Amino acid sequence: MTLSTNNSKNDFLDKTGPVSILGTSKGKKALLRRRLLIIQNVRNILIKKIINFDNFSNPIETYKIMLRKSLHFGHPVIQCDSGMKKYIRGQSNGKHFINLFRTKRYIRKALWYLTKYAYKRKNILFVGTAIPSARYVATTALKTKSFFVNFRWLGGMLNNWKTLRKLLQKLKTLQKEQKNKIWKNLPKKEGIARLKEKQRLEKYLKGIQMIKGFPEVVIMTSQTKDLSAARECKKMGIWNLSILDTNCDPRLADLMVPANDDSASSVKFLLFNFAKAIQAGRALSVLKKKLKNKLTKKKQTKSRAKVFLKEKKL
């Protein structure tokens, strides 16, 4: 031994040093494996039983549903993005077909991430201004108590958050004025101008009117139509989940689901499953809060009982 001291503690560390290090590394690996297995089991339970996606004894059934919902149809071969080539299965009549095996894998991944972020109570924003997805974006956001932009993405909505907050405040004041009938006392021209301004702001900002904090998760259904939104997410470091067709850029998304974004049935199917994942996450966080409150109450009653017994003894 190179080091020797009278201290028995140091001597023990000296002797068992290399062995203990090996032991801890093996132990850490075993713990990591266990943790991964637990995570996988939880993920499977969430996706199969709670979210009810891929909940069939015959896995072919899931692919049949995906085919019925037109998830596999891509864009013409000429419009294909180089980054999307690995997600393509084949082509017919000059149009690409998306690989549904990969789509299913990415849907499962997306559902897990959405459940996790919803459990953490993160602000979720849905973005989809294309005609097939606009309606479903609004309904999904309302169902999950999230926020949405489905008419037009105003440039700098995320970059210039301060100016957006000012616009939201302006909309609130205009709505209050209309409710309190203040415009009746104003000249006719000014009253009409204020009404038009209120209607214009509502058209663009109705989905994010009640937002309090900065959006932490963005779900996009039409990347080609909302490219500025995708670029802003990338610039601001906001986690972005996108439904990507064969003509989209996967580099602008943190997580993607390769699927048809032009079909209403395809977008509706995906958003329906996303909504279930968010609802599951929110429900789990509510349960956690309730359990925490129960535990704190129990602790308080125990401590009170101990104090009471001590006082009695005295």
UniProtKB/Swiss-Prot annotation:
Presence of keyword Ribonucleoprotein: yes
One term under GO cellular component: mitochondrial small ribosomal subunit
GO MF: structural constituent of ribosome
Alphabetized CDD domains for the sequence: RPS2
Entry keyword annotation includes Transferase: no
Gene Ontology BP annotations: translation
Principal subcellular localization: plastid
Keywords of this entry: Chloroplast, Plastid, Ribonucleoprotein, Ribosomal protein
Subcellular localization, as worded in the UniProt entry: Plastid, Chloroplast
Name of the molecule in the record: Small ribosomal subunit protein uS2c
Species of origin: Stigeoclonium helveticum
Gene name, Swiss-Prot/TrEMBL: rps2
